Amino acid sequence: MRVRNRKGATELLEAHPQYVILNPADAKGRWQEIFGNDHPIHVEVGSGKGAFVSGMAKANPEINYIGIDIQKSVLSYALDKVLATDVPNIKLLWVDGSDLTDYFEEGEIDRLYLNFSDPWPKKRHEKRRLTYQSFLATYQQILPENGEIHFKTDNRGLFEYSLVSFSQYGMKLKGVWLDLHASDFEDNVLTEYEQKFANKGQVIYRVEAAFE
């Protein structure tokens, strides 16, 4: 999600260390200590303006959430939502999420969310897709045995590619939704993109895949 630079975004992020972890590499292996409990930890890569991760944190107080985004302006808007939600079970990271092993130990997180990732449709950019095999190998390191990836997209090509990638990696497809909003799936929390697409009547695809 590209947005204009927000004046004062850096200062806003730095002013709220209770939510924004500015040196997450130093937190590697210490996330339970940082949250102050041993609750499960769920991570969203590419949190955008934070509607999903803040909504999930509010709905599930027994789970700790971490939202990651590389764009400081975008993350500052996510922080606005977190401050408005006023829940303790959420942290934000202003980092590149391409190698999550920089910030998490083996098996340290319990679930990963990939919502409306860049589809990188050109074949020469395949390795940049967040469901490419090398990314899956990284995710497997930081997730436990049977750890899950929950994936949503509006892009049919990325959806089909990801189904194949998950399967070829040996993951179990626990659930596949060809039209999420027309299904009986409960407790769906929308992202900003998802709300926009839903308003236009676009189909949303969803997958739950688990490592074995």
Swiss-Prot record:
Region: Interaction with RNA, residue numbers: 124-129
A Pfam family that the UniProt record links to this protein: Methyltransf_4
GO CC, alphabetical: tRNA methyltransferase complex
Pathway: tRNA modification; N(7)-methylguanine-tRNA biosynthesis
Catalytic activity, reaction form: guanosine(46) in tRNA + S-adenosyl-L-methionine = N(7)-methylguanosine(46) in tRNA + S-adenosyl-L-homocysteine
Keywords: Methyltransferase, S-adenosyl-L-methionine, Transferase, tRNA processing
Keyword NAD: no
Residues at the catalytic site: 118
EC number(s) given by UniProt: 2.1.1.33
An annotated Gene Ontology molecular function: tRNA (guanine(46)-N7)-methyltransferase activity
Stretches of the chain forming a coiled coil according to its record: none
Residues the entry annotates as binding S-adenosyl-L-methionine: 44, 69, 96, 118
Chain sites annotated for binding substrate: 122, 154, 191-194
Function according to Swiss-Prot or TrEMBL: Catalyzes the formation of N(7)-methylguanine at position 46 (m7G46) in tRNA.
UniProt record similarity statement: Belongs to the class I-like SAM-binding methyltransferase superfamily. TrmB family.
Protein name: tRNA (guanine-N(7)-)-methyltransferase
Organism: Streptococcus sanguinis (strain SK36)
Name of the gene this protein is made from: trmB
